[in-house]
Amino acid sequence: MKLSNDIITIEVAAHGAELVSLRKEGCEYLWSGDPAYWNRHAPILFPAVGKPYNNELHVDGKAYPMKQHGYARDSEFECVNVAVCECGSVGTMRLIQSSNDAIRQYPYRLGLEVCYRLSGSAVEVIWTVENLDERDAYFQIGAHPGFLLPDYHAEAATHGFIRYYDREGNPVGPVMVSALDDGNRVPRPIVNIADCMPITADTFAHDALMFEGGQVTKAVLCDKEGREVLGVDCPHAEAYGIWAPHKEGCPFVCLEPWCGICDTKGFTGDISTRQYIHRLAPKEKYTFAYTIEVYR
């Protein structure tokens, strides 16, 4: 699916309903998916964000397999609508329920529609989750877009900056209360993160940075002079992840608003007690949204 207006053009793959290109005036901003570093672009994390402990979710005492970040990113979607309206170009994709064995293994039947809407130099991504089951259903959802570092040179000491904002639009120096150990959270407070954080070769030496409790709802990628290049804003975000593979010469970074988070190490509780879990009654729908805006 391809959408464009006078300023930006995006492309979305049927596989994972994944944004695979974001261009402004011919300049690409989204990571290419080069498998030498990371073979994805902007996967949708659903119905799990991060890694469940032991790759299992527990429902009423029974364990169900669930890999890191869920099944949506490896499932097929169908395009159900493309239109041009007063607010801009709009395209919607719907999860094909039969496209992945992991969908059938999940203990709840959930529908997922993903709408991409262009407005000026911004892309709004709207997720609508529907409970197709006859009992309450539980899920998490999140975004994982990767963006090219502006004017990247591997030999540079600093590759740019990330500026953090809270829900009210105020710059914030967030506090990390946990870090990752084999994909699960363990207590490891880090309190000296500035509201404008430099990106260096060692920023992600210990995996992703995670900011919990809604401290951060918007992260902005800045160039080496501190000028804002693009931002990812999600008023719903309960947690926010910043990540890149710790590999020499990695030229991108991911800005990840989450409505959910990975399990703490050793967690084996019921799915209903997972942190930042969302519950839907039968036939109920819920909508989440985030926006990518290109500034320059």
Label each region the model flagged.
Residues 1-59, 63-67, 215-237, 284-295:
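Beta-strand-rich N-terminal accessory domains
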Residues 8, 24, 69, 74-82, ...:
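Acidic/His-leaning functional-site neighborhoods
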Residues 136-138, 146-149, 153-235:
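Active-site/ligand-binding surface loops and adjacent short beta/alpha elements
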Residues 94-100, 258-260, 293:
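Generic short beta-strand segments
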Residues 3, 97-152:
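Acidic, contiguous internal or C-terminal segments within carbohydrate-active enzymes
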Residues 91-93, 112-114, 125, 141-143, ...:
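Hydrophobic residues positioned within well-ordered beta-strands of beta-sheet architectures
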Residues 274-286:
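Intrinsically disordered, low-complexity Pro/Gly/Ser/Thr-rich segments with frequent PxxP/GP/PP motifs
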Residues 62-120:
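Extended, loop-rich substrate-binding clefts of extracytoplasmic carbohydrate-active enzymes
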